[in-house]
Regions:
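N-terminal, positively charged regions that mediate nucleic acid binding
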Residues: 1-38
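Short glycine-rich or small-residue beta-strand-to-loop segments that form or flank ligand, phosphate
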Residues: 4-11, 42, 49-57, 126-128
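Generic secondary-structure signature for well-ordered alpha-helical cores
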Residues: 27-35, 73, 77, 127, ...
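Structural signature of FAD isoalloxazine-binding scaffolds in flavoprotein oxidoreductases
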Residues: 136-143
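Conserved small/polar residues in nucleotide/adenosyl-binding loops
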Residues: 149-156
Length: 160
């Protein structure tokens, strides 16, 4: 039986990547000020709106709204005509303190009994289809994405 197999690669402006970059920027800020911060941050975005949720434990406060706006603008969403930009989008922060149950699971002196809280680990596989051991469809998708990201960034193709 024949089947079709495909892979996807998205650039920095894709909504999933925007959400990941916002979460990453927030985590980086927490860790810059308190290396023992515990962060579980989820970000969702849509037309004109960003929702940030999760559990945090840190000795420091960070300005979630400013970091979020700066990240969106750095990605390139800077014009209201995009219907999503860092200057005017709504930002809802539903961050709260890490639960005591998770705290007990992740704060242990014995590293072998250390828990991961509610965080999971995703993994893939290596194959010999390409030099970097990635499936050829994914490797090609990444190459195309890198190429058109370069064309957009250098304004070679202004419509991108």
């Amino acid at each position: 039986m024949a089947y079709l197999f495909s892979s996807e690669s998205v650039s920095e402006g894709h909504p999933d990547k925007v959400a990941d970059q916002i979460s990453d920027a927030l985590l980086d800020q927490f860790l810059a000020y308190d290396e023992n911060s515990r962060c579980a941050i989820e970000t969702f975005n849509t037309t004109g709106q960003v929702v940030i949720m999760g559990e945090i434990r840190s000795k420091e406060y960070i300005d979630i709204s400013t970091i979020t706006r700066n990240t969106i603008n750095a990605i390139g969403y800077t014009k209201a005509e995009y219907q999503f930009d860092g200057n005017s989008c709504g930002i809802l922060s539903a961050i709260h303190e890490q639960s005591s149950d998770i705290r007990r699971g992740v704060d242990r002196n014995d590293a072998e009994n250390q828990g991961a809280g509610d965080q999971g680990m995703m993994f893939g596989y290596a194959c010999n289809e390409t030099e970097n051991y990635m499936p050829v469809t994914l490797d090609l998708a990444h190459l195309i994405t890198v190429s058109y990201t370069h064309l957009r960034a250098h304004e070679t193709l202004r419509y991108l």
